[in-house]
Amino acid sequence: MARPRLIAPSRTLLFVESHPSSPHLAVPSTFPAPSRLAPSGVRSGVAGGLNPENRIAYQGEPGANSDAACREMFPELEPLPCPTFEDAFDAVETGLADLAMIPVDNSIAGRVADIHRLLPESGLHIVGEHFLPIHFQLMALPGTRLEDIRAVRSHIHALGQCRQILREHDWAPAIADDTAGAAREVAELADPTVAAFSPRLAAELYGLQILLEDVEDEHDNTTRFLVLAREPRDFSLHAGPMISTFVFRVRNVPAALYKAMGGFATNGVNMTKLESYQLGGTFFATQFYADVEGHPKDTALALALEELAFFSVHLKMLGTYPASPYRAQIAEPAENRQLRPTHQGNEV
């Protein structure tokens, strides 16, 4: 049987939000106005101390994983869909939204492209984090049977994370701009031979039927989101664990990075993330992005940052915020220490 020809994603809808104090300021979007349906099956990780009021911006269409993350962490806010990450950043900078929910890492796909570049340039501050388990549902028009399906639409990363079921059923993968957008396109096509891999929320929003649940290859797939605001929050009285995020560039001398990192080791500060990326399309200007445990006012972290600054030509704090409770679930087991090399029965 011949494969159906799939049309390009539809871009006919328009959603324009105007700032009440600036009638000429608007953020155009091809997405419909966000719904207030509650999500199901998402993991909580609320950062205390925030006092959001109106809207939270995210990149993607209504029903996307970023939409679900917004609804889970801030159910009192109105999700504001934005076509691009830049638009989501701009919505906060211009006052169209109080916060933005931006994905930064995925446990399978790795870091989200461009965020490490956009975040330092934006002038926004990280004020929270959220971990969302990523599950994809096979959805189609109501009444569709599995044997009717010939092709499945989704974002390229989602298709890559659902390879097994695609091979089992010999379904043709079709790339869409967005996982939620794939569900919308299936509803618009009204073709029972075309289905979508999308979040559960998308089926509710676009009136689709879920045929198979959690079809992803790896069920521990998780995305970490950062919550951004125009101004930093004061978490000095927060009693729980904190995370501090910053970017830096070291001096172009031998062992500069090694020496810059030494302060974290000698002061007992745990670094949970360290990544490098090139600046400005060059191969000689490298910037590092880091997450560490603690608050800059803590003596240990203050000393470590002081030593880092000595060996750096640039150091910028992006935010200090409460650690998500989910971190306690993914903490390294104590028994892993037994895997370290030993000498005559003693740890070395």
PLM region spans:
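Domain-level signature for soluble enzymes in the chorismate/prephenate branch of the shikimate pathway
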Residues: A2-V348
